[in-house]
Amino acid sequence: MYEHPFQLKSLNTFSVNAFAKSVVTAHHEHTLLKFWRKAYRKGKPVLILGGGSNILFLENYSGTILLNRIKGIFITENETAWQLHVGAGEKWDELVVHTIKKNIPGLENLACIPGYVGAAPIQNIGAYGVELSQICEYVDAIDLYSGKKIRFTCSECDFKYRDSIFRNCLEKYAIVSVGLRLCKKWKPILDYHELAHLEKFHITPRQIFNFIYIIRHKKLPDPVLVGNAGSFFKNPIIDIKTARCLFQIYPNMPYFYQKDGRIKLSAGWLIEYCQLKGYIFGEAAIYPKQALVLINSKKIATGTEIAALALYIYNKVADQFNIYLQPEVRLIGNYGEINPKKLFM
């Protein structure tokens, strides 16, 4: 545990050079609650942070950053499933590797996602046809005001596409652990177009993991080398009537049917169609290999530069398609999270 003025460049994968008044590392629930309450009593803002892989600091932060490093991976099993109880401070990708090594399938499609376990329920992480909501049994969180620990069942988490009850209640709850249920009757999920060709093979979880590892490292920049937060925008979901109108104009537009009858579009394709792939805006840019990823390649771009590039993309896509992209990345200002609607209107 430590507390001191801190530069945040190493604590966000965009490598934005912002500062906070203080940073505290919490390895236990009581430490996390103690320092949150200490700042709250002083009227100071507090931001609970995991790996900083889904945030963009627009300016210096005037309060305390609480690094959630509550550890622990506990595995039990019965005849039908493995049940994992995982501390919020475990790295997500290390958890996936841990299960693969123990021959526990179910997380392989979610390989190589940066960040910590505690952040996974907030945005209902997903990749290659699998979302956290499909395997989450519960989320344990502390009500920061009452100090009580609450267990949210999967249904109570109100998971949606890149959204959950926690996304809108970040100032009230601190996630401390997540419960996962992985079925022993394993069936590969190969619906995603880049995995579809694997159906003809007798595929194993480890092989899917290895394949996704290769894909992601080809498509996405390593944040250690190039500042980025992965996909900056969510894939837009539209009604079928709007989709049909768009398909008449853009017959090659990729789309994905949703269970509720709506249509999900590829935000990356929309951006690329606007000829923005590789576009440079000051010290920020759009990644040449994946239009959905904004980069800070020299690690000298400011948060406002990256946000300005995102706004430029937003306006270009809106003008071309009348579709309004929404950021997946959380925007952090001087006193905390900023409602994206204030920037993307």
Curated annotation (Swiss-Prot):
GO terms for cellular component: cytosol. It comes from the Bacteria. Its main location: cytoplasm. One of its GO terms (biological process) is peptidoglycan biosynthetic process. It catalyses: UDP-N-acetyl-alpha-D-muramate + NADP(+) = UDP-N-acetyl-3-O-(1-carboxyvinyl)-alpha-D-glucosamine + NADPH + H(+). Pathway: Cell wall biogenesis; peptidoglycan biosynthesis. Its EC number is 1.3.1.98. Its cofactor is FAD. Keywords: Cell cycle, Cell division, Cell shape, Cell wall biogenesis/degradation, Cytoplasm, FAD, Flavoprotein, NADP, Oxidoreductase, Peptidoglycan synthesis. GO terms for molecular function: FAD binding; UDP-N-acetylmuramate dehydrogenase activity. It is found in: Cytoplasm. Residues 16-185 form the FAD-binding PCMH-type domain. The keyword Cell division applies. The active site is at R162, S231 (proton donor), E328. Cell wall formation. HAMAP family: MurB. Belongs to the MurB family. This is UDP-N-acetylenolpyruvoylglucosamine reductase. The lineage of its organism: Bacteria, Pseudomonadati, Pseudomonadota, Gammaproteobacteria, Enterobacterales. The gene is murB.
